[in-house]
UniProtKB/Swiss-Prot annotation:
One of its GO terms (molecular function) is fatty acyl-CoA hydrolase activity. It catalyses: hexadecanoyl-CoA + H2O = hexadecanoate + CoA + H(+); tetradecanoyl-CoA + H2O = tetradecanoate + CoA + H(+); octadecanoyl-CoA + H2O = octadecanoate + CoA + H(+); eicosanoyl-CoA + H2O = eicosanoate + CoA + H(+). Its EC number is 3.1.2.2. It is found in: Mitochondrion. GO terms for biological process: acyl-CoA metabolic process; fatty acid metabolic process; long-chain fatty acid metabolic process; very long-chain fatty acid metabolic process. A motif (Microbody targeting signal) lies at residues 481-483. Pfam families: BAAT_C, Bile_Hydr_Trans. Strongest expression in heart, liver, muscle and kidney. Weak in placenta and pancreas. This is Acyl-coenzyme A thioesterase 2, mitochondrial. The keyword Lipid metabolism applies. Monomer. Catalyzes the hydrolysis of acyl-CoAs into free fatty acids and coenzyme A (CoASH), regulating their respective intracellular levels. Displays higher activity toward long chain acyl CoAs (C14-C20). The enzyme is involved in enhancing the hepatic fatty acid oxidation in mitochondria.
Amino acid sequence: MSNKLLSPHPHSVVLRSEFKMASSPAVLRASRLYQWSLKSSAQFLGSPQLRQVGQIIRVPARMAATLILEPAGRCCWDEPVRIAVRGLAPEQPVTLRASLRDEKGALFQAHARYRADTLGELDLERAPALGGSFAGLEPMGLLWALEPEKPLVRLVKRDVRTPLAVELEVLDGHDPDPGRLLCQTRHERYFLPPGVRREPVRVGRVRGTLFLPPEPGPFPGIVDMFGTGGGLLEYRASLLAGKGFAVMALAYYNYEDLPKTMETLHLEYFEEAMNYLLSHPEVKGPGVGLLGISKGGELCLSMASFLKGITAAVVINGSVANVGGTLHYKGETLPPVGVNRNRIKVTKDGYADIVDVLNSPLEGPDQKSFIPVERAESTFLFLVGQDDHNWKSEFYANEACKRLQAHGRRKPQIICYPETGHYIEPPYFPLCRASLHALVGSPIIWGGEPRAHAMAQVDAWKQLQTFFHKHLGGHEGTIPSKV
């Protein structure tokens, strides 16, 4: 029997440690938690097809611990990466640690404790974490469980032209302060998929960035908007362009020469942006899609209600009432829904919980803030975090559905995610528990539990792509929710 490890998977990256470790024979049963056969796992890990002699499994006497990633080296942010370690002692306890610094230098970290199998190998797709930042079988846990070193920091990607680098380390032992470093590697996750074209948009009053797939067009067009933080965020649009859509990330305040506040917004600006997208030679009509989260989701509802040429809209934790400022369109005005700051609660950590602050748009003068969704001719998908503490997203989605159906409109699709907070991002972004709210002027909690929120993000990302392909043209079909 050969004592040499086979060469690693051709599409994997292997970094060898300078540290050596002796391994010894072991008499152990195979774990029932394995999802794969030993044979298929060995093919990924590059381990030999060891022959069992009686109850003794012979392993090499000395070998270097190595980290294996697939895809190798780098991949798109929304893609999973397979992580494995080989060259450990049988049943060796180890701690895996992931570290990432954002563009401002803020540190995010996660760690988990594991135990190698009888061959001294560890595959995160079949080995459960025994504790740490998470527990259980979570192959991508080291990413979605990342937490900021300092509180109130949300992971945001400002420049999609550069990747974020994740440092992965394998350390000996399970102690609170793990032992010596066994091996490490650097994994880059990019936001601009290969071949995707990035075109800044400065046409008339419109300020944004258009992302086009690498293939020949025309493509279904989507306008993408974020919330009250203002500025221009491109990372969702750039990732979505890699799925076959022409996506324009649209700024609407606090960016370049746009208004510095959103006290007054005019839908004519959004109409101009939509018309620009529809007139682009690589965008196919007859209508466009809208994608928005928070205030951006609310604006999707307003655009679909007042403007023509909108075929489909995805609203992520949006309000059915106009919030934060007055909205104008051709002589019509929507006032903002009222607020009562006396309804702010304070958490044990001293952060504000504002979920009850907004008045109901169903009562009294606040009824005038209700967006007239019954005018909309588009079809809707509402993605809802049931633990959203920014506002009552599930209530708003249900009220929009009632209003649409009462006026004979198509019933929207509503997908609700338990234990999911406000910021439903593309897959593998870590949960932001609390951060500064631009309108409130103080830190607030956003809601959500890390694992449930992470699973919701993976599902929501698939759902919105399927929805847009179905209603804007392209691949038809629906995906049953896994959450």
